[in-house]
Curated annotation (Swiss-Prot):
Protein name, as recorded: Probable glutamate 5-kinase
InterPro entries named among the record's database cross-references: AceGlu_kinase-like_sf, Asp/Glu/Uridylate_kinase, G5K_ProB, Glu/AcGlu_kinase, Glu_5kinase, Glu_5kinase/COase_Synthase, Glutamate_5-kinase_CS, PUA
Record function comment: Catalyzes the transfer of a phosphate group to glutamate to form glutamate 5-phosphate which rapidly cyclizes to 5-oxoproline.
GO MF: ATP binding; glutamate 5-kinase activity; RNA binding
PROSITE patterns on file: GLUTAMATE_5_KINASE, PUA
Binding site for substrate: 58, 145, 157
Localization annotation: Cytoplasm
PANTHER family linked to this entry: GLUTAMATE 5-KINASE
Pfam families: AA_kinase, PUA
Keyword annotations from UniProtKB, A to Z: Amino-acid biosynthesis, ATP-binding, Cytoplasm, Kinase, Nucleotide-binding, Proline biosynthesis, Transferase
Domain of life: Eukaryota
Organism this protein belongs to: Schizosaccharomyces pombe (strain 972 / ATCC 24843) (Fission yeast)
Alphabetical list of HAMAP family matching this protein: ProB
């Protein structure tokens, strides 16, 4: 995996997410060839400067709608999946045609949440993208809409792009949209709305500044704020800028690469969500939080909360569990709740039935209650992540973790 750049040439790993509105006309669903060409030129320029670039591209469903001459996206999931099957091939073919003009090879990477639910699959996905970058290829990532079922979908490519950026330890995630930046209010309806240029804490941003997502896509400003939170928590700088001006990416990166940040350079309007330098989520913890679907929840008491949040934190013992919700098996992910609020995720060693029997009990009682004792912990420390407390983001993903 490409490490964070520390050398003087300041090359970066950059993920660029393109929404449907940046790829196809919202009404006719015709591909916006001129805009796509500008994006291709920008990516190739970034590559020539030594940066690694990954595209996360929406547009498969819109391309399918155009090919089948359908007026709008249907609500039935199976119909959407069929349309995606028609459009995805046409979308990647269009990208390949445009990139080929500049002799830039690309690769299609289709992902579902199920593909990264197992740790080994998550590592393989990250390593595959890493190898593509090593070969000088531009990976083009999209959710596999043809296979994803509602329960395990990422839901939108903003989320997918943030997970991809965290998975490959990217430096920047650019979310290209139909507005220049985040505003204090909707600029389409309020002429007094002010641009917000830099944000250090995503929790301080009011999602009511949002603009509506397109009728074809599933996004909107709310999903971008969620993506910004995911990205910055894993050490990725997240930037929102206008998709019709992709060259702004080049200008922003060039400014970030400059040794003189104070020089007077007029940059295009954009919003920069600054990466968290403290409390960044480690790779394994990022996978636990965002790669896995929660199958239930555990409520814990104050003693357990203090034990798992202290500096030399411990694993979760059964004595600290007060309630069990849902039906899940051993080795599945669950939400951890304290005082009615989600505080993190855990990969449990026992099923919901087993934990319900041993909750509130000391570990030495497990064998007498269950008839066996797999481990004294409900969840090991390394498979327990608490929001905002897990630091030291791994520099790379490898397959030899223990």
């Amino acid at each position: 995996m490409s490490p964070k750049s520390k050398s003087t040439n300041k090359t970066y790993t950059i993920v660029i997410k393109l929404g449907t509105s940046s790829i196809c006309d919202e009404k006719t669903h015709e591909p916006l060839i001129s805009n796509l060409s500008l994006i291709v030129e920008t990516v190739v320029k970034l590559r020539k400067l030594g940066h690694n670039v990954v595209l996360v591209s929406s547009g498969g469903i819109a391309m399918g709608l155009r090919r089948l001459d359908l007026p709008k996206r249907p609500s039935k999931l199976s119909a959407v999946q069929a349309i995606a099957a028609v459009g995805q091939g046409r979308l990647i073919s269009l990208w390949d045609t445009l990139f080929t003009q500049l002799r830039q090879p690309i690769a299609q990477v289709l992902i579902t949440r199920n593909d990264i639910a197992e740790r080994s699959q998550y590592v393989n996905a990250a390593n595959t993208i890493s190898e593509l970058l090593h070969f000088g290829v531009v990976p083009i990532v999209n959710e596999n809409d043809t296979l994803s079922v509602q329960e395990i979908r990422f839901g939108d490519n903003d989320t997918l792009s943030a997970i991809t950026a965290g998975m490959i330890n990217a430096d920047y995630l650019f979310l290209l949209t139909d507005v220049d930046c985040l505003y204090t209010d909707n600029p389409r309806t309020n002429p007094d709305a002010k641009p917000i240029l830099k944000i250090h804490d995503t929790s301080m941003v009011n999602a009511n500044v949002s603009t509506p997502g397109s009728g074809v896509g599933t996004g909107g400003m709310k999903t971008k704020l969620i993506a910004a939170d995911l990205g910055t928590s894993s050490g990725v700088n997240v930037i929102i800028c206008r998709g019709s001006k992709p060259s702004s990416i080049f200008d922003i990166i060039r400014q970030e690469s400059s040794d003189n940040k104070n020089e007077s350079v007029e940059l295009p309007l954009h919003t920069h969500f600054v990466a968290k330098k403290q409390g960044r989520i480690r790779d394994r913890h990022f996978w636990l939080l965002h790669g896995l679907k929660s199958h239930g929840s555990l409520e814990i008491d104050r003693g357990a909360f203090e034990a798992i949040t202290r500096t030399n934190r411990a694993g979760l013992l059964p004595v600290g569990v007060t309630k069990v919700h849902g039906h899940f098996s051993a080795h599945q992910a669950v939400t951890v709740i304290y005082n009615g609020e989600e505080i993190g995720r855990a990969l449990v060693n026992y099923s919901s039935t087993e934990i319900d029997l041993i909750k509130g009990k000391r570990s030495k009682e497990i064998a007498s209650i269950l008839g066996y004792n797999e481990t004294e912990y409900v969840a090991y420390r390394d498979y327990l992540v608490v929001h905002g407390l897990n630091s030291h983001h791994d520099s790379q993903v490898s397959s030899d973790e223990h």
